UniProtKB/Swiss-Prot annotation:
Belongs to the snaclec family. Shows greater sequence similarity to the beta than alpha subunits compared to other heterodimer snaclecs. Heterodimer; disulfide-linked. It comes from Bitis arietans. This is Snaclec 8. Residues 1-23 form the signal peptide.
Length: 148
């Protein structure tokens, strides 16, 4: 009987330690893991600069979300953004200095594009799986992304 309780307790500990993570990605409590990164949606409405600053304060290496392929975008839509009401989030892609030098706030290479041409910051319209340039002073919900 004692052995059974010990094994059951051990399995419970393993289960609880893995809950909220994907395929062994170790993320902070309340964050979801995908492909060696952690993600968390925030309902607060902020302008782009405030949202980016907020993300950098949440976890070491955290920034507004960067998307590098359709699979990652689908993960964000299905697992993360489902908690948000309007389906429009800030993302880390920007050209705040108006130099036509687009880049992700986390320093990652711009290797996947899906946008219209307009302003200097980007929102992700999750219902359409589409990016749109918009004015950086508007307010939107956002997703933070951090290395696991």
């Amino acid at each position: 009987m004692g052995r059974f309780i010990f094994v059951s307790f051990g399995l419970l500990v393993v289960f609880l330690s893995l809950s909220g993570t994907e395929a062994g990605v170790c993320c902070p409590l309340g964050w979801s893991g995908y492909d060696q990164n952690c993600y968390k949606a925030f309902e607060e409405l902020m302008n782009w600069a405030d949202a980016e600053k907020f993300c950098t304060q949440q976890h070491k290496g955290s920034h507004l979300v960067s998307l590098h392929n359709i699979a990652e975008a689908d993960f964000v839509v299905k697992k993360i953004v489902s908690v948000l009401k309007d389906g429009v989030i800030w993302m880390g892609l920007n050209d705040v200095w108006n130099e036509c030098n687009w880049g992700w706030t986390d320093g990652a290479q711009l290797d996947y594009k899906a946008w219209n041409v307009e302003s200097n910051c980007f929102i992700f319209k999750t219902a359409e799986n589409h990016w749109s340039r918009t004015d950086c002073s508007g307010t939107h919900s956002f997703v933070c992304k951090s290395p696991a």
